[in-house]
């Protein structure tokens, strides 16, 4: 339930697609805080695939977490797929990432880290483009001494490294 709350706080919609009996799936959905209308039981692999494709057709990006043999096709179809550590080899092979253990509580942290990483990479690229677009032409036109442009490039690289070190810090609420 805590993982579902945290994922919702990150702006994600949660769906349960399971091959288990519908009654059991609905009970688990209510227990963890997923609406019964977003919990589907007795799904075949094709049912899961159809539901994911329907969400994608609505413009949604799908992150799928699975562990079973029947999850292979839907894991391959999702934009991002995660197999739990104890997943069958087929599910692990079709996944982008294998999460060690079966702790879904690590999923919100994983998503926060991925978002932060994308943001930092984007900022680093923007900085590099800015620096190169401004200072390389100045050096080529000899309006900036080559040694100063070289020093600036070294400082720029150092800035990118230091800026990227933010990724090593624990996130808010995460233990070090």
State each model region's role:
Residues 1-123:
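Conserved ATP-binding TGD loop and adjacent catalytic N/P-domain core of P-type ATPases
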Residues 12, 95-176:
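Membrane-embedded transport module
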């Amino acid at each position: 339930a805590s993982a579902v709350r945290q994922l919702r706080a990150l702006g994600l919609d949660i769906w349960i697609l399971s091959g288990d009996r519908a009654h059991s799936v609905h009970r688990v959905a209510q227990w963890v805080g997923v609406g019964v209308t977003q919990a589907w039981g007795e799904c075949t692999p094709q049912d899961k695939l159809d539901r994911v494709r329907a969400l994608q057709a609505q413009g949604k990006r799908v992150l799928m977490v699975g562990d079973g043999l029947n999850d292979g096709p839907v894991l391959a179809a999702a934009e991002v797929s995660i197999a739990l550590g104890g997943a069958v080899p087929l599910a692990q092979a079709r996944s982008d990432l294998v999460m060690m253990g079966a702790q879904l509580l690590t999923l919100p942290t994983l998503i926060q880290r991925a978002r932060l990483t994308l943001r930092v990479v984007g900022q680093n690229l923007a900085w590099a483009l800015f620096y190169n677009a401004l200072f390389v032409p100045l050096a080529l036109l000899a309006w900036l001494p080559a040694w100063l442009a070289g020093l600036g490039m070294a400082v720029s690289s150092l800035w990118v490294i230091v800026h990227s070190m933010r990724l090593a810090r624990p996130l808010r609420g995460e233990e070090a």
